Amino acid sequence: MKKSVRPAVSRASGERGKPEVAGTTGTGKPVSKSSTAAPLSKVKSSDDLLAAMAGGNPTSSNAVAKTKRTASVGTTASTLDKPKTTSGTTSKRLTSSVTKETNLTRDRLRTSRASANKKQSAAGTVVGDAASGKRSRSQVLVESESRMSKSKSDGQISDKVALEAKVKDLLGLAKSKDVEILHLRSELRDMRVQLGLGGKELQEGPEEEEEEEEEEKPHVSAITAADVESTLILLQEQNQAIREELNLLKSENRMLKDRLNALGFSLEQRLDGSDKLFSYASLSPDLAAGSGQSDGGGTGTLTSSVEGSAPGSLEDLLAGHQHGGSADNLDSESSEVYQAVTSSDDALDAPSGASSSSESECAPSRERSRRGSSGNASEVSVACLTERIHQMEENQHSTAEELQATLQELADLQQITQELNGENERLGEEKVILMDSLCQQSDKLELYGRQIEYLRSLLDEHHVSYVLEEDIKSGRYMELEQRYADLAENARFEREQLLGVQQHLSNTLKMAEQDNAEAQEMIGALKERNHQMERIMESERQGRAAVEAALHEYKDAVSSEQAELSRCRAQLDQERQRVAELYSLHTAGDKNDICQLLEGVRLGKEEAEAKAAKLQEGLEQAHSDLGHLQETFSKLDREYREFREQAQRQLSEQERALEKQRMDLQEKETEIADMKETIFELEDEVEQHRALKLHDNLIITDLENSVKKLQDQKHDMEREIKILHRRLREESMEWRQFQADLQTAVVIANDIKSEAQEEIGDLRRRLQEAQEKNEKLSKELEEVKSRKQDEERGRVYNYMNAVERDLAALRQGMGLSRRSSTSSEPSPTVKTLIKSFDSASQGPPSNGASVTPTVSAAPLPRTPLSPSPMKTPPAAAVSPIQRHSISGSMSAAKPLSSLGDKRPTYTDITIPTEHLLRGSAASRPPSALQRVSNMDSTKTISVSRRSSEEMKRDMSASEGASSTSLMAMSAASAPLSLSSSSPTASVTPTTRSRLREERKDPLSALAREYGGSKRNALLKWCQKKTEGYQNIDITNFSSSWNDGLAFCAVLHTYLPAHIPYQELTSQEKRRNFTLAFQAAESVGIKCTLDINDMVHTERPDWQSVMTYVTAIYKYFET
């Protein structure tokens, strides 16, 4: 590719006076790259968008390169003013494609929401029809659960659609920025043409030709990967290519600045520099005309010296090679330039070849007459261009950083999807196990039903009345069982359908992969055939060159023989003259001598004639060989032309086949997109299935509880039957005894009456004494409570006053030390005070301290990973008044714990259940009372476990109630402190999974709060935290943090005593980073950044900075 471009470059560089060099040198770039924007408007999801991006621009290309190539095509077809119009049209096309993509995403979001609402309404009508029977309560629960699950699935779908829309918006923004960069490049190109800097344009042609060759090779292999992982990998590679292109643009900008500085055109002296370049541009044709050298070396020297004096630049070498004509000439001229010319004035005054000094001296005088409005315009345009280029680079960095963060989150979402698929399979297995257990429970229910029928028959035999609630409940349970058998059958049918769809999709995907592999094989065979044709053409060229060399040799031999023949003819003429002279002498002189001479001459003549005849034969033979070689050459030329036409036809056929393969690949991509949409629908169905499964689990637990209740009722019935039998026997014995004692009852009635009156008086006296004692004890209890509260309050007040005094003294000492030193580290006395305060805020323990540490004091000693319900800030960031309020709330919670220490046992609550026995305790044996009390205590334990949340709410609501209600509720809340300590007591599975997710990734809650990606959510949190701070503008995680002020501002919101923010400046980077890292390490945040790297790099690694900021957020906010 380089060989094909260099002649055009050399021809363009020869016309130095024409300003169209920068526009014509880009003709070597390919035109086909502009078609890569077409697949971007046809995608349907984020994965298809990524695949289209990867397919259109596989490895080392980016959006900037695309726009650069389209602009180069536009510039070849028009003059220098046309790139602006072409860039405007491309920007309009790109913005229209972006608006089309956003409209597509909005329509897709509306259709998905409408379908979800339709599903909800259909489910609501079905539930309403089914709720007309006896299952109203269970159907209401099903409806609420289904609504929650569908709302959750709709939220996930909307989150995915929002992410896709956000990615598309970011890509549209990147495209618009690329269009602006293209516009700026066109203006830069115009400025280069005006300034005479065309070397850079000459280099871009062969470099981008090589890039296209490298891009077309992995183009086919990049499309072969059809899954999401390969797409993400390709997008990461593309992002890396974007980074490389940005680095290339930076180096280009830096090199242009260096070249301007080397030429003497600094940013403050642009006017003079541009005037001097214009003077040189007007002078260079005269110098070229005045030079007397034939090789053009002087012109190459001046061009290389003006166009780029920076050592080692490729533009200088290329320009020297074009103007000089050889590598030796290039080296000599470049060395001449670097030794002789050091500034723009020297370049203007330096002689070129044989040009005289008068011409170089009259050039500045000509240029001074041309200074005017062009200098001001060039100065303003260059300043605007540099500012806009800096702004575009910053925006490009932020966009690339956000794209990388979005890619990482997409990879995380893919991993979560895989985990959910595995969990779905596990839930399917668990569903089978639960169905088996449900069948076993139904068998047990049938067995218990038979036992209840037997017990009813026994009750009917003894004529005991009973309530028919069991029949109603059993009918309801049978109805529930039938319903869940139907649900299980429907779930099994849906699973079979899903398996069939999955099998169909996998078969389709395999067929698509096979077709793709066949297409790859065909393309490889065509490429191999093409290479073979090229090798044959090369061998034919070599044979033709050999034939031409032989022909040249024969021509040289013929020319030498013709020269020899002419020499022999001249010699023959001389001999004939000599013979004529000898004949004349023969006639005049002696004949013998003459005869001898004639004989010698005759022999010489014969030899000369023989030699001439031989030479004539050789000449004829050479002419015949020459004719034969010409015929052979013409034949080979015809064969070569026929072969070239055949090769061109085969290449056109191969191109048509390749285009057909590309169309097939696009069809496969659309099929893959449809498959991905079906996969999304299947994931929605999986979410619904999971919600139904959760509801089934809840109903199964209800069924198990109902079975336990039935067992308890069975035991109650058996116990009541035994008690009734016993009462019947006792009443019969009492009746007989009453009949026997009826006669003596009248005699002793008066005695019994008098004794009863005495006992009544004794009981009244005891009752009065017990009431007085109770009042006295209640007063003592109130006095003890008030005394303890006063003592604790006084102790806390004294301790807080001492802490405030110590902190005031420490602040004064730290203020003095801060003025004298540059870095402020926390003194060890503050740490010891904080530790002592934390230890003192938890003690001293009271009599009931065995219960309260698990309730109130547990959240205080926190770790960075454990989410605490009460977010207590660290001790260094809490004021003394806040500490006093925290300690006051803790001391107010202690009397409740002291009351909880006097709770009765479980059997104290079971006394009201004795009314079921319909008799007095005096007529029953103690064993029956013991059994009944044990049974009721087990009931209260189970009820207390089920109603843990209600008891907690009652406990919190009844703090101001009477002590009797607290005593009554403490028995039920005592086991709650044990059960609520486990995470499965009062936490639903969704909240439990959310807690696990927050422990693994603390940014998930932040992303839910602010919306969007985790990177943007953390960025918004940082911006919210640093509101009101001066000299801080956080737009990314790289350049916004390079001076350390952002770290200091974020940490100053939590640790104001550690960071004197008003004294900090952006110039003292090392001090800022040192203060921030030491403040974070003082509270336990480990530093993961290197101070030297942060100080010396303009753009630190955004991932490491984001990790450190995440650690800060995790410590202070979770």
UniProtKB/Swiss-Prot annotation:
Biased composition regions of type Pro residues, renumbered to the chain: 861-872
Region feature (Disordered): 1-157, 198-221, 289-379, 771-790, 837-876, 920-1001
Feature: compositional bias, Polar residues: 57-102, 112-123, 838-855, 930-945
Compositionally biased spans, kind Low complexity: 343-363, 961-986
Primary location: cytoplasm
Ranges for domain Calponin-homology (CH): 1012-1117
Subunit structure: May interact with both microtubules and actin cytoskeleton.
Record-given protein name: Cytospin-A
Originating gene: specc1l
